[in-house]
């Protein structure tokens, strides 16, 4: 985990009786950190920044680091996990299923959450419709972006 002292903090919180969820992109080994739930949010291929807009170096680094199958396996094998994906297009379900098919041990449908991509209520409603249909078809869970619905696309929420 990136934060200095994060393992000690997690241990202290757990020892104090707190339920601890760690959310991560799944690119860094868990290294024995304690938690009740690991919420893994692997980045899909459309998350790679546009090289023309952000520079070739940034785009290349992101693409090289966005998926670490061996790290996803380490989390899945050693922790109670859920896998959360931000979905902007119905066709992404194929990429999601392919990614999940490579995880060992594989998560069950109830451990997979699909969240519509969007930063405003209108796009969330539009995308939420097809994401809900994907969830009905696959048995995956629907995950709303409640913070945007309640507060809008504001920093700190």
Residue ranges: model-predicted function:
Residues 1-157:
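Conserved AdoMet/S-adenosylmethionine-binding subsite of the radical SAM
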């Amino acid at each position: 985990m990136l934060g200095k002292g994060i393992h000690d903090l997690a241990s202290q919180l757990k020892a104090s009786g707190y339920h601890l969820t760690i959310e991560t992109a799944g690119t860094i080994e868990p290294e024995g950190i304690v938690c009740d739930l690991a919420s893994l949010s692997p980045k899909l291929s459309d998350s790679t920044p546009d090289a023309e807009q952000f520079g070739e170096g940034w785009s290349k680094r992101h693409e090289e680091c966005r998926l670490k199958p061996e790290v996803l396996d380490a989390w899945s094998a050693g922790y109670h996990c859920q896998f959360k994906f931000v979905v902007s297009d119905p066709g992404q379900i194929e990429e999601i299923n392919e990614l999940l098919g490579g995880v060992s041990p594989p998560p069950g449908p109830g451990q997979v959450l699909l969240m519509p991509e969007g930063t405003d209520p209108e796009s969330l409603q539009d995308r939420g419709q097809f994401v809900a249909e994907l969830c009905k078809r696959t048995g995956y869970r629907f995950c709303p972006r409640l913070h945007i619905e309640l507060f809008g696309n504001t920093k700190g929420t």
